[in-house]
Amino acid sequence: MRVDAKNKRRSAVLHKKATTSFKLAVVVVTLQCLKGRRGNAGIFRIQNMKKQIKDYVVRSNERLSDSYSLLKLQPADGSAVIDTCAGQFVEVEVPDSKTTFLRRPISINFVDRDRNELWLLVRVAGEGTRHLVALAEGRVLSLVLPLGKGFSIPADTVSKVLLAGGGVGVAPMLYLGSELKKRGFEVAFLLGARSKGDLLELEEFEKIGCVYVSTDDGSMGEHGLITKNSALQKSWQMLYCCGPMPMMKAMAAYAMRNNIECEVSLENRMACGVGACLCCVEDTVEGNLCVCKEGPVFNIKRLKWQI
């Protein structure tokens, strides 16, 4: 009896420690981050970065369409926006919701260092995101950040890169395109949406590079799927992609046929954001990996896609 009681107390202590560690999400990771191509060769590299739980204030909430809002946030304590990599994401606590218990994973859309702002592009997909797009200026949000591994930089021999985004998959492409342009790459975007009204942040993308557009109804750009856009007839040396799974698989197949390096940002359903709940597992050549921790960005050669 005494031994059983001791074991129970020990189990309770271990459970409490594990739960506390998970809630704080303080996990030391080696993140792959962009370093300059025409400066320091390599990939995004920030060593020993810790995930943080930090309050951010909503500085503006711009409704871009019926389904999307752009939140621009600043650290509540006046500090600088934490270093992040294009392709990473944050977990946002949803305020004022009695039924949304889990944080919501949102891609980092852009980091404006001049204004010290972190941008999040939010698509209404359920009760949690409905609360987020309705937030007023001045509201405080609790974020866990930065999460996941972002995009890598192309080899020094690469000059022309294509960034393809469909639907909410355009979100990480703005930040990635901006970072690549700073490092001397020729950046172009291929953006797809159901209609003209669903095309997001076009003016921001046009500041960075050439923009090719496809809409399902032909209301803007080329009529049809992004995977049929004439931009794919041009010569590209690196492809980045994020969007619906059929689109990403089609773009991956295009890249393989043309011997182009390709990275995709997966949108598997997530919960914890730190690899604990195992609900975002993807089958890869290395076995089952948690997208939130080992991704969301993967080179297509690592994925067991039938393409």
Where are these regions (language model features)?
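Ferredoxin-reductase
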Residues: 50-139
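Short, Lys/Arg- and Gly-enriched loop/turn segments at beta-strand edges
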Residues: 98-106, 148-155, 292
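Cationic, low-complexity basic patches in intrinsically disordered or flexible, solvent-exposed regions
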Residues: 9, 24, 33
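Short hydrophobic alpha-helical segments enriched in small aliphatic residues
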Residues: 5-8, 12, 16, 41
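Local cysteine-cluster metal-coordination motifs and their immediate loop/turn environment
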Residues: 267-296
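Short, Lys/Arg-enriched N-terminal segments with co-localized hydrophobic residues
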Residues: 33-48
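FNR/FR-type flavoprotein reductase catalytic core
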Residues: 127-267
